[in-house]
Amino acid sequence: ASSTMPSPSESAVLPRRVALHAAALALTPRWVWGQDATAQDWAGSECIAPSKPGGGFDLTCTLASQAIAKVRPAFAPLRTRYLPGGIGAVAFDRAATGRLDSHHALVAFSSGSLLNIAQGRFGPHPVDAVHWVATLGTDYGVVAVHPQSPFQTLSQLMQALRDSNQRMVFGAGGTLGSQDWMKAALLVRHAGKDPRHMRFVSFEGGGEAIKALVGGHINVFTGDAAEAMKAQAHGAKFRLLAV
């Protein structure tokens, strides 16, 4: 990560690359990919979202299913199965050790997951313990507040962080040190405060974090644009301050 502090006024938040890996590919050679794959090979396949429903991992599985259906319309739809736990740690451990209870499984991950793997937070498994299949796209961070929040702009939020002795509660689908946590930490640091003292609540996916924001349990959501747009499309009410 760069040591240069981006200015929130520039709406500069690091993009998150979303990737899929398939541990089953290395464990079950009979599962054929590419041009040689058949509908029978694909039967029973699923995409595992290592979170609760509604977040970026859920959306990644949806995109994967749509992509496969477009190029292989005869294949059975790719099912989505949710496996929360450690915001990806449980899914990675089971994929790396062949304990996914599925011979035909893709697992949605992000560059935030890779950061946790590099930091050793997903167990002792190396990054090449699984087979990385594809990158689906990029996503951008957002800063959002409750629709009745007094903050209408990011500048107002930053001023409140500078002036208030009462710390705000941030929340997102990421643990301490994750990319979602880093977004909140950048805001707090830019306001002249110590990020180590900020209040941050980790959720099992962005969907759960957005529910907490809408319910008034956190003050600021620092997640990703795709999960925010998906939540709004399903009726969630919140105010975006920055992308």
Where are each of the predicted segments found?
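Secondary-structure junction motif
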Residues: L176-K183
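N-terminal secretory signal peptides
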Residues: A1-L14, V18, A22-L27
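Flexible hinge/capping segments at coil-to-helix
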Residues: V145-Q166
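N-terminal (or domain-start) structured segment
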Residues: W33-V127, L176, G192-K230
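A structural signal for short loop-to-beta-strand junctions that line the ligand-binding cleft
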Residues: H104-V107, P124-V143, V169-G171
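C-terminal lobe and pocket-closing loops
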Residues: A228-V243
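Loop/turn elements at helix/coil->beta-strand transitions in domains of secreted/extracellular proteins
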Residues: S102-H104, Q166-R167, A236-F238
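A bilobed periplasmic-binding-protein/Venus flytrap-type ligand-binding module shared by bacterial periplasmic
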Residues: I48-K52, Y140-P150
